[in-house]
Swiss-Prot record:
It is an enzyme of class 3 (hydrolase). It comes from Emericella nidulans (strain FGSC A4 / ATCC 38163 / CBS 112.46 / NRRL 194 / M139). GO terms for cellular component: cytoplasm; nucleus. Hydrolyzes fatty acids from S-acylated cysteine residues in proteins with a strong preference for palmitoylated G-alpha proteins over other acyl substrates. Mediates the deacylation of G-alpha proteins such as GPA1 in vivo, but has weak or no activity toward palmitoylated Ras proteins. Has weak lysophospholipase activity in vitro; however such activity may not exist in vivo. Pfam families: Abhydrolase_2. Its main location: cytoplasm. PANTHER family: LYSOPHOSPHOLIPASE-LIKE PROTEIN 1, LYSOPHOSPHOLIPASE-RELATED. Belongs to the AB hydrolase superfamily. AB hydrolase 2 family. This is Acyl-protein thioesterase 1. GO terms for biological process: fatty acid metabolic process. InterPro entries: AB_hydrolase_fold, LYPA1-2/EST-like, PLipase/COase/thioEstase. GO terms for molecular function: carboxylic ester hydrolase activity; palmitoyl-(protein) hydrolase activity.
Length: 239
């Protein structure tokens, strides 16, 4: 069972929500500084930031030992082929985490936040889950972002897309470092191409030279611009 998410509440009237999911072995606390940095700069003051915590589950690449994860991973690394990575993915774990992400979205909707004012995103595993959840989701979101991530269940994701494809026109922002030795840059690039092939009409893929499996200031600045575009301030001034 997951621990409760870390929440950074809006400073002004709450009009939008960003859900940011961490990567394998991390926790929501690992990304809270992102929201605090924006707070210090007077940005996104209408936004509540939610940083969920993955449950402790056995992870195959961790010799079967438990660690925080949104789903099990059997293989990892620069030498992994994209098609090979698709095989033996933890479909049950992925769907379970998608249901959890959907419950977080519903909680925000129950609080009066329109789905068009909700952004779902994450880093690595969290980004992969956000990409999958956004593509297969029942609600039209304001935006979806994934940093250093890849497309999950790419050989069968079509089976999970609702017939009316709510997020067909939703903006998607994908970003990846060229020197990523955990999730190869090619995975991110291929995933962006696949997203377009699935019918997504607003997909941005940014590459960052010399960046490994992490985030950097330029990438975060681009994410900042993306958020400002998809959930602009409603009450005047900066979000």
């Amino acid at each position: 069972m997951s621990r409760a998410p870390f929440i950074v509440p809006a400073l002004k009237k709450h009009t939008a929500t960003v859900i940011m999911a961490h990567g394998l072995g991390d926790s929501g606390a690992g990304w809270v500084s992102l929201a605090h940095n924006w707070r210090r700069r007077g940005l996104f003051e209408e936004v509540t930031f939610i940083f969920p915590n993955a449950p402790m589950i056995p992870i195959t690449v961790n010799f079967g030992m438990s660690m925080p994860g949104w789903y099990d991973i059997t293989k990892l690394g620069r030498d992994l082929d994209f098609q090979e990575a698709v095989k033996n993915q933890d479909e049950a774990g992925i769907l379970k985490s998608r249901d959890y992400f959907n419950s977080l979205i519903k909680e925000q909707m129950d609080q009066g936040i329109k789905p068009s004012r909700i952004v779902l995103g994450g880093f690595s595993q969290g980004g992969a889950m956000s990409l999958f959840s956004g593509i297969t989701g029942q609600e039209k979101l304001g935006g979806v972002f994934g940093l250093s991530c890849y497309m999950l269940l790419s050989d069968r994701i079509k089976n999970y897309i609702p017939e009316n494809f709510p997020n067909k026109k939703t903006p998607f922002f994908l970003a990846h470092g060229t020197e990523d030795d955990i999730v190869p840059h090619e995975f991110g690039k291929r995933s962006a191409e696949m997203a377009k092939e699935l019918g997504l009409e607003d997909v941005t893929f940014n590459s960052y030279k010399y960046l490994s499996h992490s985030a950097d200031p330029v990438e975060i600045e681009d994410l900042e611009k993306f958020l400002d575009r998809v959930i602009p301030a409603e009450n005047g001034g900066s979000l």
